[in-house]
């Protein structure tokens, strides 16, 4: 089983590297533990609608356009069998999105450990956007404390690149064009921050 997984991963990685080269979109790697909502977010960004999804086995890749912002987003599976391969993908992207299930604080510790396992092997700092998903499941008066807890648990002050923690709710997001959709605006604003940080990077590093 281990050899089969290794062969499959090598094939996926080879394809990944080939698809990255020559792309005009800014390439973003999206990782996080299973169940955090990565694939749901990716489909929302692509279609503007919320879809129920199944766990990602391997990776998904979608080109996403948000106004004038263009991204190539790679959604890498968060199951244990795929987490050990994150390091092969992470240095190919110019930015990182790390998804966290903020309604599951018992996994904050493990989630933070896995994030730092990746950050410690980056070949250069890059923008890190931590999306605290499922904020709708947290009482409103507790939400700021949850975000603070994630930043502290992840020890983001140690990271020498730009970082931001943004609470979102993908399942509660409505149409991206709705002026009353606070959840949708939070998601778009998070990507605006990421895009702004990417624009500060030399173009060769941001592709």
Swiss-Prot record:
<dbReference type="GO" id="GO:0003924">
    <property type="term" value="F:GTPase activity"/>
</dbReference>
<keyword id="KW-0519">Myristate</keyword>
<dbReference type="GO" id="GO:0005525">
    <property type="term" value="F:GTP binding"/>
</dbReference>
<keyword id="KW-0813">Transport</keyword>
<keyword id="KW-0449">Lipoprotein</keyword>
<dbReference type="InterPro" id="IPR027417">
    <property type="entry name" value="P-loop_NTPase"/>
</dbReference>
<comment type="function">
    <text>GTP-binding protein involved in protein trafficking; may modulate vesicle budding and uncoating within the Golgi apparatus.</text>
</comment>
<feature type="lipid moiety-binding region" description="N-myristoyl glycine">
    <location>
        <position position="2"/>
    </location>
</feature>
<protein>
    <recommendedName>
        <fullName>ADP-ribosylation factor</fullName>
    </recommendedName>
</protein>
<dbReference type="InterPro" id="IPR006689">
    <property type="entry name" value="Small_GTPase_ARF/SAR"/>
</dbReference>
<keyword id="KW-0547">Nucleotide-binding</keyword>
<dbReference type="InterPro" id="IPR024156">
    <property type="entry name" value="Small_GTPase_ARF"/>
</dbReference>
<keyword id="KW-0653">Protein transport</keyword>
<comment type="similarity">
    <text>Belongs to the small GTPase superfamily. Arf family.</text>
</comment>
<feature type="binding site">
    <location>
        <begin position="133"/>
        <end position="136"/>
    </location>
    <ligand>
        <name>GTP</name>
    </ligand>
</feature>
<dbReference type="GO" id="GO:0005794">
    <property type="term" value="C:Golgi apparatus"/>
</dbReference>
<dbReference type="GO" id="GO:0016192">
    <property type="term" value="P:vesicle-mediated transport"/>
</dbReference>
<keyword id="KW-0931">ER-Golgi transport</keyword>
<dbReference type="GO" id="GO:0015031">
    <property type="term" value="P:protein transport"/>
</dbReference>
<keyword id="KW-0333">Golgi apparatus</keyword>
<keyword id="KW-0342">GTP-binding</keyword>
<feature type="binding site">
    <location>
        <begin position="75"/>
        <end position="79"/>
    </location>
    <ligand>
        <name>GTP</name>
    </ligand>
</feature>
<feature type="binding site">
    <location>
        <begin position="32"/>
        <end position="39"/>
    </location>
    <ligand>
        <name>GTP</name>
    </ligand>
</feature>
<dbReference type="InterPro" id="IPR005225">
    <property type="entry name" value="Small_GTP-bd"/>
</dbReference>
<dbReference type="Pfam" id="PF00025">
    <property type="entry name" value="Arf"/>
</dbReference>
